[in-house]
From Swiss-Prot:
Coiled coil: none annotated. Gene3D superfamilies: Nucleic acid-binding proteins, Recombination protein O, C-terminal domain. It comes from Legionella pneumophila (strain Corby). Keywords: DNA damage, DNA recombination, DNA repair. It comes from the Bacteria. This is DNA repair protein RecO. The lineage of its organism: Bacteria, Pseudomonadati, Pseudomonadota, Gammaproteobacteria, Legionellales. One of its GO terms (biological process) is double-strand break repair. One of its GO terms (cellular component) is bacterial nucleoid. The gene is recO.
Length: 229
């Protein structure tokens, strides 16, 4: 049996039988993993097996199945409520539906941690929106789906501030089109400038289409609660 220690967050939980829980954990060391937690219904473990609690988890692999051995919290549960809570549920759903199992990406894990801590502290919706847009971009990169905010997709020419572009999912930005985005906005987003509401609105529009393309038709339920993307 191989034992591993992981930094983890619970992304999804499903009860299994009378005593156990099936978990989907997002970990720094192994990415997204599925594991069985025996005794998961005990009061102590139920208090730990919740979203937004940073965990240290020891697992072992037997017959191509991961089992938890020990679970401890490394800090208290993040205080998420209202828009922050719905946003946390949103990014958890994104991870659940887009990541392949056992594919570690420490940069994405760090982005997840940064985003959760940021939305827990945020007091303005615009701040939360900007954090979500940056996380969505980190997720797109982790999944190998990126596009240039600096170059026109079909010609390779530089984006011009005074020109208008249309976003084509799976391709990038093309000059003209029906749904026009100012080149100025694209260059601002490329520079990570989401301080103006117009830039943030364009980033939201672009990321919504890009994420939907990545999801391949899967529905994100948290959008109906908050509509963060």
């Amino acid at each position: 049996m191989t034992s591993k220690s992981l930094n983890a967050w619970v992304i999804h939980k499903q009860w299994s039988g009378d005593t156990s829980a099936r978990l989907k954990l997002f970990t720094r060391e192994m990415g997204l993993i599925n594991c069985l937690c025996k005794g998961g219904r005990t009061p102590k473990k139920q208090s730990l097996l919740q979203a937004f609690i940073p965990l240290w988890v020891s697992i072992e692999e037997r017959y191509d199945q991961y089992y938890t051995r020990n679970i401890e919290s490394t800090s208290s549960r993040l205080d998420l409520e209202g828009h922050s809570l719905f946003s946390g549920l949103y990014i958890n759903e994104l991870l659940y539906y887009t990541l392949s199992p056992d594919f570690p990406d420490p940069d994405l894990f760090d982005a997840y941690l940064f985003t959760l801590n940021g939305i827990a502290l945020a007091r303005e919706r615009e701040v939360i929106e900007a954090l979500l847009r940056r996380f969505e971009w980190a997720l797109l990169k982790a999944c190998g789906y990126t596009f240039s905010f600096l170059h026109e997709a079909r010609t390779g020419e530089l984006i011009v501030p005074d020109s208008y572009y249309q976003f084509v999912a799976g391709e990038g930005f093309i000059l003209g089109g029906d749904k026009k985005i100012p080149g100025e906005h694209l260059l601002a987003i490329a520079a990570d400038n989401l301080s103006e509401s117009a830039y943030l609105k364009s980033a939201k529009f672009i990321m919504r289409q890009a994420i939907d393309h990545l999801l391949g038709g899967r529905e994100i339920k948290a959008r109906s609660l908050y509509g963060p993307a």
